[in-house]
Amino acid sequence: MDRSTFILSLLFTLTVSTTTLFSPVFAGTFDTEFDITWGDGRGKVLNNGELLTLSLDRASGSGFQTKKEYLFGKIDMQLKLVPGNSAGTVTAYYLKSKGDTWDEIDFEFLGNLTGDPYTMHTNVYTQGKGDREQQFHLWFDPTADFHTYSVLWNPHHIVFMVDDIPVREFKNLQHMGIQYPKLQPMRLYSSLWNADQWATRGGLVKTDWSKAPFTASYRNFRADACVSSGGRSSCPAGSPRWFSQRLDLTAEDKMRVVQRKYMIYNYCTDTKRFPQGFPKECRH
């Protein structure tokens, strides 16, 4: 273990009480791991808890959240997005803490006209401040089959992944005065809702309600993570690989290829938005 990893591990031990160990959750069922929080019946758990669907119509969307809160971990979920003309809809899938100074790790999938590519929107909030958007066109049809969308969150960095391919990294640069999510536990949330005022072509394309209900599907949830409860966090026995995991050269190369080919917006290159200079993290 190198010095920086040792120091981060020590800080983690001091700030997170690990008095109770638990086994990681593998492919937890939706009826035991999640609560459907809104939608008046538009969210459904099916197939003995193995499948969850969210629906949106003109009256309402729907959403769910995990029963547990996590403080660091590797979170995986398979999603199949709204097919056909999904313009104006947003499928949000994200980790978020409570309060006015919340932390958040955010996937949003912006609906499209039939035949156009989906836009995958990512963002990181720290202490209630976001404005760190990166957007991608997916290199496959995310409505034809299930694909895995993952977040790796440890003391070193946050990594967004699609089918185990890293697409974005947000590093812990607290030594530069940049806030990093490390103290506030987060739940996993997802929702399907109407955002046609901005979601598709900046709001030019509105939701076609004749195509409703719109439906997104979820399966194969996995959380290999530290579970927070009552101010204490319980972590997997042993030394979980994800806790000290960094991107190796192969993973970095894959991420650069995705960013070069499929990234359509990066706040770190938006000179109109930041005429006085980019945020400090953009240099790393």
From Swiss-Prot:
Enzyme class, first EC level, given as a word: transferase
Pfam families attached to this UniProt entry: Glyco_hydro_16, XET_C
Record-listed xyloglucan binding positions: 108, 121-123, 131-133, 197-198, 202, 273
GO cellular component labels: apoplast
Record note on modification: Contains at least one intrachain disulfide bond essential for its enzymatic activity.
EC nos: 2.4.1.207
Signal peptide bounds: 1-27
Domain of life where this protein originates: Eukaryota
Record-annotated disulphide pairs: 226-235, 268-282
Glycosylation-annotated residues: 112
Protein purpose: Catalyzes xyloglucan endohydrolysis (XEH) and/or endotransglycosylation (XET). Cleaves and religates xyloglucan polymers, an essential constituent of the primary cell wall, and thereby participates in cell wall construction of growing tissues.
Protein's UniProt name: Probable xyloglucan endotransglucosylase/hydrolase protein 25
Taxonomic path: Eukaryota, Viridiplantae, Streptophyta, Embryophyta, Tracheophyta
Gene: XTH25
